[in-house]
């Protein structure tokens, strides 16, 4: 039967949160209690939805942390949110949502804080769970490539209004709306290297009635390629040599354990260039 969620009280909504509807937010620090350990957060979710002991819940929580790519799971269980990186905190949020085995998962930019190597793992995990448990997923994102990979249908919105909707292949490959086409034109291409990245206003404008129409002055967009050559004579603005960085966590009453986050990293950044750092 149809349920109007807006009309429900907070107490009534408790019956739907978790096992029916779960959400992964973009910023995990707004959802995690800074006074509670990571293990506490996970165990509460498990015992709210499953009839298991605290010890059994701890085992399940550790296994879930491993699924979302968090190393040293037992140590992480004892840590607090501020002791984890932003990416680690987001993975904890994803684990909490998946533990509840919801019928509907609302994911608001869930992989934004993750590096590309973990992003693929998380997306594959979400997709496998969706199929295994017949779970529906509302995936909110600005990443068009990710939409094409994970979604069956897509809705393109602008200023709070729907501009176009339909099957993902139809919308992304044969878009009908001018705004959708402008978004797709803005995607960087490997074949060209413009002086600046194009924006939607380069490909559309408003007519006298305020309606969006295709831009006709695309020739004004400077797509001249820059030289990719690095001669070695360019000025180096940043040089890092054999950088090491470690963090320490409590172990026992007086001891502490080292976690080496950076292990002998070296690189140079030339003037006017962009260096992509993945990981």
Residue ranges and their predicted role:
Residues 94, 105, 118, 122:
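Hydrophobic anchor residue at the start of the ABC signature
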Residues 147-149:
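A short, surface-exposed alpha-helical micro-motif characterized by mixed small hydrophobic
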Residues 71-75, 168-238, 250-253:
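Short catalytic/signature loops enriched in Gly
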Residues 4, 56-75:
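Conserved ABC ATPase "signature" region
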Residues 153, 165:
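Short, glycine/charged-rich "phosphate-handling" switch motifs in NTP-dependent
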Residues 99-103:
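A short, proline-enriched helix->beta-strand linker immediately N-terminal to the Walker B motif
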């Amino acid at each position: 039967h149809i349920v109007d969620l807006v009309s429900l009280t907070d107490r009534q909504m408790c019956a739907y949160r978790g096992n029916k509807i779960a959400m992964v937010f973009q910023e995990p620090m707004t959802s995690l209690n800074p006074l509670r350990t990571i293990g506490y957060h996970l165990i509460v979710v498990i015992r709210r939805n499953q009839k298991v002991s605290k010890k059994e819940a701890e085992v399940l929580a550790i296994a879930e942390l491993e699924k979302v790519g968090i190393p040293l799971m037992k140590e992480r269980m004892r840590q607090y949110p501020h002791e984890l990186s932003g990416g680690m905190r987001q993975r904890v949020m994803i684990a909490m949502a998946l533990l509840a085995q919801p019928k509907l998962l609302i994911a608001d930019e869930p992989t934004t804080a993750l590096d590309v190597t973990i992003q693929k793992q998380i997306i594959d995990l979400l997709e496998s769970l969706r199929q295994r448990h017949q779970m529906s997923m509302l995936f909110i994102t600005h990443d068009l490539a990710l939409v094409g990979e994970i979604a069956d249908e897509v809705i393109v919105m602008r200023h709070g209004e729907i501009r176009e909707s339909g099957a993902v292949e139809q919308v992304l490959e044969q878009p009908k709306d001018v705004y959708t086409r402008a978004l797709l034109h803005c995607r960087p291409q490997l074949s060209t290297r413009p002086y600046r990245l194009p924006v939607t206003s380069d490909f559309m404008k408003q007519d006298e009635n305020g309606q969006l129409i295709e831009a006709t002055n695309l020739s004004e967009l400077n797509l001249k390629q820059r030289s990719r050559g690095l001669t070695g004579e360019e000025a180096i603005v940043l040089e890092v040599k054999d950088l090491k960085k470690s963090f320490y966590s409590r172990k026992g009453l007086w001891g502490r354990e080292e976690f080496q986050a950076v292990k002998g990293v070296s690189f140079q950044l030339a003037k006017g260039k962009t260096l992509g750092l993945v990981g």
